């Protein structure tokens, strides 16, 4: 019986949690293969930088750290080696779009065909990290918005208010 393939895309507000979920044999009973084009450090840095950027922008809603595609494969793919199918598919996606990926190959509940969970970053990995050094002290209020002076983040007791941050001159940020 011919079935239709489908593709579903989701926005991921917690990329590390989702990676852990789709690649865990303990949580996924029909997991056949997993593959990564970047290590855990990349995904941790991506999540941290995305959250920082989101706070700085002051935008409402949830921060989107990455995206996930769920792709149902035609039944013919069950005849091939699962790890090979997953690696070929993931590497082709990486080559075509130039993004880092994590993928997992699962069976559907009826075990008639495979589907791939493909998590990818919208940001590209820089060849060298972009290290910034503050040329002067920078102050941020509780909402993450930059303020001009230290006076604007000092409470009545003369201390920096909780939630406010200071990046001192010469610090890496």
Regions found by a protein language model. Name each.
Residues 1-173:
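N-terminal nicking endonuclease/strand-transfer module with a His-rich metal-binding environment
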């Amino acid at each position: 019986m011919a079935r239709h393939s489908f593709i579903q895309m989701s926005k991921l507000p917690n990329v590390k949690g989702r990676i852990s979920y789709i690649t865990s044999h303990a949580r996924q009973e029909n997991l056949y293969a997993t593959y990564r084009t970047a290590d855990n450090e990349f995904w941790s840095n991506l999540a941290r930088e995305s959250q920082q950027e989101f706070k700085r922008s002051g935008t409402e809603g949830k921060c989107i750290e990455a995206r996930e595609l769920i792709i149902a494969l035609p039944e013919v793919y069950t005849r091939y080696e699962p790890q090979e199918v997953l690696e070929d598919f993931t590497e082709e996606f990486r080559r075509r779009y130039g993004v880092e990926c994590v993928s997992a190959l699962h069976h559907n509940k009826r075990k008639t065909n495979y589907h791939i969970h493909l998590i990818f970053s919208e940001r590209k990995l820089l060849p060298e990290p972009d290290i910034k050094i503050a040329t002067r002290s920078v102050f941020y209020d509780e909402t993450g918005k930059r303020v001009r002076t230290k006076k604007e983040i000092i409470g009545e007791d003369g201390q920096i208010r909780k939630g406010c941050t200071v990046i001192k001159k010469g610090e890496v940020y």
